[in-house]
Amino acid sequence: MSGTTEQQVSAQTPDWSRERIGKFWDPGQKLMRALRRYQAARARGGVLGKAASKYWALNHLFWSTICQSEIHLNTQIGGGLRLTHPTGIIIHPDARIGVNCMIFHQVTLAGPVVLGGHVDIGAGAKLLGPLTVGDHAVIGANAVVTRDVPPGATVAGIPARIIKP
């Protein structure tokens, strides 16, 4: 999807350059920046941290509205998350996202979904938890995943079935 192979993208070490804002209008990256800075300010604590967290919460609300996406401020997200076409993405507050994942538009992570490292989720996919997706897995577009996905597998369909182990 991004022109790199599975072996070139780590499932353990975050590639922070994937979250870098590359152009003026990059709403997905700006949404992630607001979320990351909110979490950092919240962790800092104190009066300054509280004021900064309020600013970044408003910034997150602005970019969530622009993207029409719902990503809770306290969701655990590993480094290097790429939101390609970030419209209509809904992520449950109990979901955990591993490093270097890529999520396309209209994706829903419902319930306590755990994504491993370098998981690519195609447009319109629905992951209905509780479930776990292994490292380097690929979820096809419009798939409805209701069961665990093993590492390195490709799943697609409604309901999702393994098409490449």
For each feature predicted by the language model, list its residue ranges:
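Terminal amphipathic alpha-helical/low-complexity segments used for targeting or macromolecular assembly
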Residues: 1-68
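Left-handed beta-helix
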Residues: 73, 78-79, 84-93, 98-99, ...
